[in-house]
Amino acid sequence: MKVAVILPAAGLGTRMGKGTAEKAGTSRKQFMLLEGSPILMHTVRKFAASPRVGEIVIAVRAEDTEWVREVVTQEFPGGRVRVVAGGNSRQESVENALSSLSPDCELVAVHDAVRPFIDLDIMHAVFDEAAETGAAIVGVPAVDTVKQVTRGTTHVRVRATLPREKLVMAQTPQVFRHDLLLRAFQEARKDGFIGTDESSMVERLDVEVSVVPGSDRNIKITKPTDMELAHLFLREEAARSTLS
């Protein structure tokens, strides 16, 4: 069963910090260079390495489509990787990419463009789970104690301590049947619902979403310290590749 992959990459990267942005020449994390290549391209390569991925669609800001398309086609000239204009939010960007997919596509995986260390085995495990159940995400156990709070005008107060054994920290890929994800977006638009991930939108349809164990290495590069860790991970990957 072939999988279509959507990489939303239209974000502005406001959390990376001014110093890191000035050093990198851009505040947008997906375009920052990691060992000579944009983070986005490292992520694309991971999915392109899977024979189960039929197409990869990257959603970027409208003004970036031409130059990103040029960068992509230099490495992937066959049309398997495409670039489309995203929207003003992650949700709009994913929806724009979703509307461009072939109607006979069966499974759709949505993955953060700035998670370039997804493991191929985990990727295939979540593909398999979604093929069986219709909806699956990658997640890791919560290691910190999580508090539910109420925010007042002057104080933030603890309302409850959530049972850690019942919590997972959601990662990506998040993989769904094509028709199910389309319906989730249609319902969200109709209701004015804005989700922080695709799973939250599918959950609104009373659909059970399975969780496949993820990895602590599958980091989302968000802060300057994440870039330091990413350089380390990439050098480790290069060393393993040389040894093999």
Swiss-Prot record:
Query: What residues form the membrane-spanning segments?
Result: none
Reaction(s) this enzyme catalyzes, per UniProt: 2-C-methyl-D-erythritol 4-phosphate + CTP + H(+) = 4-CDP-2-C-methyl-D-erythritol + diphosphate
- Recorded GO terms, molecular function? 2-C-methyl-D-erythritol 4-phosphate cytidylyltransferase activity
Gene Ontology annotations of biological process type: isopentenyl diphosphate biosynthetic process, methylerythritol 4-phosphate pathway
Query: Which EC number(s) does UniProt give?
Result: 2.7.7.60
Q: Which domain of life is it from?
A: Bacteria
Keywords on record: Isoprene biosynthesis, Nucleotidyltransferase, Transferase
Family matches, as CDD domains: CDP-ME_synthetase (cd02516)
User: What pathway does this protein act in?
Assistant: Isoprenoid biosynthesis; isopentenyl diphosphate biosynthesis via DXP pathway; isopentenyl diphosphate from 1-deoxy-D-xylulose 5-phosphate: step 2/6
Annotated site (Positions MEP for the nucleophilic attack), which positions? R164, K220
Q: Which residues make up the annotated site Transition state stabilizer? A: R15, K29
The EC class name is transferase
Note one Pfam family from the annotation. IspD
Gene3D superfamilies membership: Spore Coat Polysaccharide Biosynthesis Protein SpsA, Chain A
Q: Which family does it belong to?
A: Belongs to the IspD/TarI cytidylyltransferase family. IspD subfamily.
What the entry lists under PANTHER family is as follows:
2-C-METHYL-D-ERYTHRITOL 4-PHOSPHATE CYTIDYLYLTRANSFERASE, CHLOROPLASTIC (PTHR32125:SF4)
Q: What does this protein do?
A: Catalyzes the formation of 4-diphosphocytidyl-2-C-methyl-D-erythritol from CTP and 2-C-methyl-D-erythritol 4-phosphate (MEP).
Protein name per Swiss-Prot or TrEMBL: 2-C-methyl-D-erythritol 4-phosphate cytidylyltransferase
Protein source organism: Solibacter usitatus (strain Ellin6076)
